[in-house]
């Protein structure tokens, strides 16, 4: 029996040509289209077996070099115990070949929008289940987010059972392969033209049955646990960011890997600084005299080594003006330098003045010139044409 002849293709056929030929023949000889036809059933098994081998690069190479008795053939050759020994295997191959067309892992998933899991279908025929991922929230001060910090978290979940090493049974002889599904965890049923796989009712999809369960985990292979996890928080994190710690979630079952731990960051606000990306904003209130004459002012920073820096405020500065102090902002979480410190000037008008202070201001006002207030002059010039009573 030549697999290429069975599918009606040449030995140089591409993977796409192999799949196309198989699909055409599989639909033609499918048992649901040929009920009670033993010859069609035999042909269906043959084309499924041929596709199973030729669609796998390793198996195809072995078949091309050694024939049906190659090293990937299994105990009975490609067509024996390792091939399409029963209709269930042939139907599973059929579903797998058509599943990719619908973006899923099975024909049933593709047709019904990935509802296979809802009906008990499993993509892991050996019953292995990856552990669930966990998520925790961690609160940081503004300074911790700026400088980075090490934290210890207590996480509840499942760990692998130490008594049975996660196997569910201390003695390997206490575990046997499920006879109903032959260790696959699934049984295949034909309904009309369609075939679908469902969870094996005998083993619950595990593919095995534990006859002598471990006393510590009761055959589950894992136990509840609380553990301390060390977390490195890099400098520059912000609220809403998420750190992924691979393998720190719940332990998997039946040899599957553990899930992951996701640490969600919440950063407290700061009484002085406001963050905008990697930049910091500092609102600096100054008196109108300092604004008019200019000054030098010591302002706080987040840098541990300095703690403050000297800012030069130029004379005649206006409220709302932003002065930039480079590299005094937040560190970039990806290590790409630091942001800037943006100092927003807020000129404060004096209140609760004494009579002496008021008199001094009146004296100053009497000496004002138009060039002292260019914005005021510009505004008055603009509205003069509309309101005749406005005077400079």
UniProtKB/Swiss-Prot annotation:
Signal peptide: none annotated. InterPro entries: DnaJ (IPR012724), DnaJ_C (IPR002939), DnaJ_domain (IPR001623), DnaJ_domain_CS (IPR018253), HSP40/DnaJ_pept-bd (IPR008971), HSP_DnaJ_Cys-rich_dom (IPR001305), HSP_DnaJ_Cys-rich_dom_sf (IPR036410), J_dom_sf (IPR036869). Zn(2+) 2 binds at residues 178, 181, 200, 203. CDD domains: DnaJ, DnaJ_C, DnaJ_zf. Residues 2-67 form the J domain. PROSITE patterns: DNAJ_1 (PS00636), DNAJ_2 (PS50076), ZF_CR (PS51188). Its cofactor is Zn(2+). One of its GO terms (cellular component) is cytoplasm. Keywords: Chaperone, Cytoplasm, DNA replication, Metal-binding, Repeat, Stress response, Zinc, Zinc-finger. A zinc finger (CR-type) spans 148-226. One of its GO terms (biological process) is chaperone cofactor-dependent protein refolding. Its main location: cytoplasm. Binds 2 Zn(2+) ions per monomer. It is found in: Cytoplasm. Zn(2+) 1 binds at residues 161, 164, 214, 217. Transmembrane segments: none annotated. One of its GO terms (molecular function) is unfolded protein binding. It comes from the Bacteria. CXXCXGXG motif repeats lie at residues 161-168, 178-185, 200-207, 214-221. Disulfide bonds: none annotated. HAMAP family: DnaJ. Participates actively in the response to hyperosmotic and heat shock by preventing the aggregation of stress-denatured proteins and by disaggregating proteins, also in an autonomous, DnaK-independent fashion. Unfolded proteins bind initially to DnaJ; upon interaction with the DnaJ-bound protein, DnaK hydrolyzes its bound ATP, resulting in the formation of a stable complex. GrpE releases ADP from DnaK; ATP binding to DnaK triggers the release of the substrate protein, thus completing the reaction cycle. PANTHER family: CHAPERONE PROTEIN DNAJ, DNAJ HOMOLOG 1, MITOCHONDRIAL-RELATED. This is Chaperone protein DnaJ. The gene is dnaJ.
